[in-house]
Every structure is written in structure tokens, then in C-alpha cells.
UniProtKB/Swiss-Prot annotation:
It comes from the Bacteria. InterPro entries: CmoA, Methyltransf_25, SAM-dependent_MTases_sf. Homodimer. The keyword S-adenosyl-L-methionine applies. It holds the Pfam family Methyltransf_25. It is an enzyme of class 2 (transferase). SUPFAM superfamilies: S-adenosyl-L-methionine-dependent methyltransferases. This is Carboxy-S-adenosyl-L-methionine synthase. It catalyses: prephenate + S-adenosyl-L-methionine = carboxy-S-adenosyl-L-methionine + 3-phenylpyruvate + H2O. Transmembrane segments: none annotated. Catalyzes the conversion of S-adenosyl-L-methionine (SAM) to carboxy-S-adenosyl-L-methionine (Cx-SAM). Gene3D superfamilies: Vaccinia Virus protein VP39.
Amino acid sequence: MKDTLFNEALGKRFCFDERVAHVFDDMLERSIPYYHEMLNLGAYFIAQNLKESINPKPLIYDLGCSTGNFFVVLNKQIQQDIELIGIDNSMPMLKKAQEKLKDFKNTHFECVDFLEIDFKEASAFSLLFVLQFIRPMQREVLLKKIYNSLALNGVLLVGEKIMSEDRILDKQMIELYYLYKQNQGYSHNEIAFKREALENVLVPYSLKENIALLESVGFKHVEALFKWVNFTLLVARKT
């Protein structure tokens, strides 16, 4: 269904409620440049990494899995026996995910706050456009928990909206991104209303800050797999 959520001002902070879940797939496709390409790229690197896994049934977590799009891609790309656990604290989102993946018996979803649970040892984690919504003081805690739960040679995918450390470049990047959204059919008002709703909810870091954060929790190998203006996909490997 087409995203018309911000035709008018919400009058409240953005949250992942039933109204958002109803249009979320369209919102993702029209708001994140090269969204599907990043999903496929991330799935490829996880699939390649799993070839080195000694676990007969590797476990993969998707934290903030929303409507389950990444698991749809993973199930298509990975041929070996795997277990997928998607975690999100929005039940409306998970209902969409469960419907999409109901035929995949290897895929399970949990409606919990992933900041408050312990993870099993896993071969891979994904945080796709999620870290930016977590309070800055909690990001390092979460990433350290993920690092400690990753098996040796396991990987973490991080997709993020980012900012430039240069004020002028950051302004230009934002302007280009708004032009992109206009070309996707969003009006000036919709862009402005969404920006207002996301203020202090979505807090982006720079590319350098995100890489430094990953390195600070123990990752020695962090690479940018993809970057378009103010969006990036990172992979970090535990060695």
C-alpha cells in the first residue's frame, strides 16, 4: 500500500505502530536509495561467510526486522540449512513479517526489546537501518553484546543513514536526498512533516563514527560495502 502517512502532520513523534506497518514496505522502497540492492548485497556476504562456518545449522539474527524483507532475500540466496530469528518490538510489523514468511519453517520471530535479552551464539547478525533509532548511549552496549554473541569469523551487517562531518557537505547531501524523495513521489509537505516527526528519534552518525564504534567493541575488520550520499551498508567480521 502506498505511503501517504505524512500527507498531514502526525502531531506526535514517529513510532512503528500499526499505521506505519501498513505502509512500511512502500516507505522503505521510496525512502532508502538502492534498498533492494543493499538487501541482496548483504545477503550475498552472509551467504559467502556461512560457507566457512563449521556449524551444521548456522543461526542468523535480524534485529529490528520490521516486516521481514531481509529474511525473504536470505531464504532465496542461502541454500544450506539455517535458522533465522527476527526480533522487533512492534507487533504490527511482526504480523506482516510472519505472513510473508509463513512457509519457511526455519524462520521465527520474537516480539521483544532486543536491548533487554541475551542472544544465542550466532554466525551472523543484521542491523538494517535500526542503529540510528537507538539512543546513542545504548548503541555501544548493543554492539558489544552482538560482538560477544558472534561465533568466530561471524559477521555483522549494519545499514545506516549517515551524516557528513562537514556542515556544508551535510547540507548538500540532505538536499540531494530530499530531491531523491521528491522524484519518488513525496511532496514537499510530506518530506517536511516526516522530518519533523523524526527529529530526535532518528539520530545519524557519520561514516567514521559508525566504523569507530564497531571497532571500539572489538571488530578489527570493518568495510563499507555500499554508499550512496548519506546511506551506507557496512560489514564487520569477528576474528
